[in-house]
């Protein structure tokens, strides 16, 4: 039960102790300066009043709450710097991506230009591709020819068994008569 009340107590103490220390606009100037200075003596000390006399109460209170908050200013400065860093990183990544994409496009254009332009030399990629295709066709044809020759000279074992069975059945049929 006390563990549930503890955050509530700390938050109330925080509000009580630090609530008034962040605002300098709440009262008259002489209450914030000290009890020794009277309101009549303020113009002798050249102390300026709060700049937000014409604002409505809520805006005046809001301006007073955020007027001297170093934490708030520090957070805004930190957020500003973080946003700058994030936008810088995004800019660098975008430039890198566009650079890579441009280089890839340039390589593709060079490759297309080399394929479209007929090469007189024997080292062009188009001639190498045709040579490779012809070599594959020739090797495939030679392998198929070897298999065909092997099959024609050596009948398969199924054919031999089938032929033997036919001969046996003919011999048995001849013996019956």
UniProtKB/Swiss-Prot annotation:
GO terms for cellular component: membrane. The keyword Membrane applies. Keywords: Membrane, Signal, Transmembrane, Transmembrane helix. It comes from the Eukaryota. The chain crosses the membrane at residues 75-95. It is a single-pass type I membrane protein. The keyword Chaperone does not apply. InterPro entries: TEX50. Its main location: membrane. Residues 155-168 have a biased composition (Basic residues). Residues 1-23 form the signal peptide. It is found in: Membrane. This is Testis-expressed protein 50. It comes from Homo sapiens. The lineage of its organism: Eukaryota, Metazoa, Chordata, Craniata, Vertebrata. The gene is TEX50.
């Amino acid at each position: 039960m006390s563990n549930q009340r503890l955050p509530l107590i700390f938050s109330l103490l925080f509000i009580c102790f630090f609530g008034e220390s962040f605002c300098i606009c709440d009262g008259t100037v002489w209450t914030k300066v000290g009890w020794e200075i009277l309101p009549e003596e303020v113009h002798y000390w050249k102390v300026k009043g709060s700049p937000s006399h014409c604002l409505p109460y809520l805006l005046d209170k809001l301006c007073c709450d955020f007027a001297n908050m170093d934490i708030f200013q520090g957070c805004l400065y930190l957020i500003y710097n973080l946003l700058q860093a994030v936008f810088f990183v995004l800019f660098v990544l975008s430039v890198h991506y566009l650079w890579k994409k441009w280089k890839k496009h340039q390589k593709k254009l060079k490759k297309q230009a080399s394929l479209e332009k007929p090469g007189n030399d024997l080292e062009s990629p188009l001639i190498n591709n045709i040579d490779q295709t012809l070599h594959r066709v020739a090797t495939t044809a030679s392998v198929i020819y070897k298999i065909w020759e092997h099959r024609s000279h050596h009948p398969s074992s199924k054919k031999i068994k089938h032929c033997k069975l036919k001969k046996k059945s003919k011999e048995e049929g001849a013996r019956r008569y």
